[in-house]
Amino acid sequence: MSDSTPGVGIGRAIRGAIGFLTRIPVGGSEADWNAFRRAAYSLPVVGYLVGGLVGGVFFLPVQPPTLVAAYLVGLYLLTGVTHADGLADLGDAVAVHGDADRTRAVLKDSATGVGGALLLGVTLLVVALGVLSFAGIGSWRAFRLVVAAEVGAKLGMALVACYGRPAHDGLGSQLVGGLDHRSFA
């Protein structure tokens, strides 16, 4: 079977997306990465996977504060901290004074400053309070909300990948701009 066989290409794209967006050891290859870069549909598929796995905590017979902790720990164990690192970089860039070159330099700096720590802390607080608000709505409703949130987030990524333009060369430039509106549909 070659990559021109539809099922193989789809499988490669989904494996590439899982390898990129999660810490699940799928054993991806360069062919998987390349298939993923051409397949915006693979992003929401991973949203269903992540939402389904992390949303499972809502079926645990625990008190709401423990549920919130289990959700956050499960989310970061499953997806890693790459997204949190990017969020901290964004917070540092927003806090810096200067021109676009100075802002880009802060984005590339590996140290986290006050702006990054503040944005990350506020974001974690908002997510924790959001999850806490699910207490009492029922396990299945909470589960469906988490799945919908993850799928929606991945659809947002697909939208940016298909319609956005990369600001500079980097990892994002390998995804953004390589697809078009037909890929999103």
Q: What are these model-predicted stretches?
A:
Residues F36-V54, A93-G136, W140, R144-A148, ...:
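Multi-pass membrane catalytic core of lipid/isoprenoid biosynthesis enzymes
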Residues E30-R38, V106-A111, D169-V176:
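Short juxtamembrane and helix-loop transition motifs at transmembrane-helix boundaries
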Residues L155-F184:
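Solvent-exposed interhelical
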Residues G51-F59, Y76, G80-V81, D85, ...:
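Transmembrane alpha-helical segments of multi-pass membrane transport proteins and ion-pumping complexes
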Residues M1-L72, Y76:
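Topogenic membrane-insertion module of multi-pass membrane proteins
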Residues I18, I24-G27, A95-G98, L159-P166:
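Hydrophobic, membrane-facing alpha-helical anchors
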Residues A17-L21, V73-H83, V147-Y163:
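Transmembrane alpha-helical segments that form the membrane-embedded catalytic/substrate-channel core
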